[in-house]
Amino acid sequence: MPRTYSQELINAVSKANPNYPGVALAKACIQANLPSKYVAVALKVTRMTLYSWFRGKPIRFKNQQLVEVFTDLVESDTAKGLLPAKNTTHAKAYLEEMIGEKI
């Protein structure tokens, strides 16, 4: 079962520059209750890479557009009330529908 985000990460993200795409992604994922394990699979990166983005590290050009679109979709669905995910099953189903394949 995926773990929730640590309070340390939540505090770091809240203090980080929101103009960084990775920080915006982290805020969206935390607010939407999407586990990093599933988000990493959806973005086709490792959890280590995902967490480095969350902390403001640069995102390679080939991934940056995907991250920005993903973040926009999650923020939009949160505003519509489709998120936050109620549990990990809901989060997994949401991401599987988004990417069109099993996680």
Predicted regions and their residues:
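Short alpha-helical "recognition helix" segments of helix-turn-helix
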Residues: 38-40
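Recognition helix of helix-turn-helix/homeodomain-like DNA-binding domains
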Residues: 45-59
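A short, Lys/Arg-rich alpha-helix, primarily the initiator
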Residues: 2-32
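Short, charged recognition helix plus adjacent turn
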Residues: 1-6, 78-103
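Helix-turn-helix DNA-binding elements, focusing on the entry/boundary residues of the two helices
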Residues: 25, 36, 64
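DNA major-groove recognition helix of helix-turn-helix/homeodomain DNA-binding modules
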Residues: 61-80
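DNA major-groove recognition helix of helix-turn-helix
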Residues: 43, 54-55, 65, 71
